[in-house]
């Protein structure tokens, strides 16, 4: 849909801790006997995303595949903000017979936008929740557009609140409209599974055919329709930093989703950020979902305990990387695709010295866009919505960057383009 540039926007998912993490105590080892998949709920506000997440944990808890978390346990963002910890995604762990899932639920709409665009809620697939009472709504469409932009290719639809609808034709209409909408945004509208049910009925153990049985059908559809992703384990380790904690007497923990490679306890690692020279440290512990890991691998949402690093030395947007594999830069050449008005982008063209926000992995940074220097370049030309264009980008601060690094371009609260770094200039 977005030419060749709107592929996977790789980044990390935030790990949600109920309390500050106390890494690597007497935790059991993490079981890797099943494939690990990152999934999430998207959709319009109040359509039942968090209720559905709670219902999934309830149904699976009765089979030993999850710990039941009620709505309040998942939707704890206000409590966390009051304590000064801005954990804006909730991570829930569960297992089906076939897979282990990390499920991300962002209770607030603003959190969704921020986390989907920076890739903090990067998913291998998603469940889009739509209320039978409303059908598709503005945020349904916005989240579909965002999912497409950040590289989510596989969805399952859950039509929620069917217990409040008496007219079967209304449900058919909601399904038909959703299939059309999916096709409009570049998804497989004809073959995407659409499950009808009521998350509330599942939570309250009422009307099993639209309650518990619907949740079971949904999980079967997720198992079957969302492919197990191929993880990039051969490349050098890289983890974009999502959050940082300090543990008294132990050190500093950084959390994030491993983008590629693997990391073992005791290995040396480099912290790369907006400073001139990266600094090295040693990994003293690795944890995922309160289970100890010998190694973190691509796709894991991990907490990494670092030796001799102060809390203020590391911040969101930096990366942990295998030494000498990643460097920070201020100026790059990039191939850009500017979204058309119909794709949710700008309505008007822009010229040289345009200064949007660039969302790169887990950071956002202002950049100035200019046409590359060279003979015959018209520096007064305009870039139109829908154009593919090559431009130089100068960032306001050094940022960890690589050739083939993907990023999103944002302005005024919406995505206006996508980009791919083609050359490092300085």
UniProtKB/Swiss-Prot annotation:
GO BP annotations, alphabetical order: mitochondrial translational elongation
InterPro entries: EF-Tu_GTP-bd (IPR041709), EF-Tu_GTPase (IPR050055), EFTu-like_2 (IPR004161), EFTU_2 (IPR033720), G_TR_CS (IPR031157), P-loop_NTPase (IPR027417), Small_GTP-bd (IPR005225), T_Tr_GTP-bd_dom (IPR000795)
Region (G1), start-end ranges: 43-50
G3 as annotated region, ranges: 105-108
Region (G5): 198-200
Main location group: mitochondrion
HAMAP family for this protein: EF_Tu_B (MF_00118_B)
Family per similarity comment: Belongs to the TRAFAC class translation factor GTPase superfamily. Classic translation factor GTPase family. EF-Tu/EF-1A subfamily.
Name of this protein: Elongation factor Tu, mitochondrial
Organism: Meyerozyma guilliermondii (strain ATCC 6260 / CBS 566 / DSM 6381 / JCM 1539 / NBRC 10279 / NRRL Y-324) (Yeast)
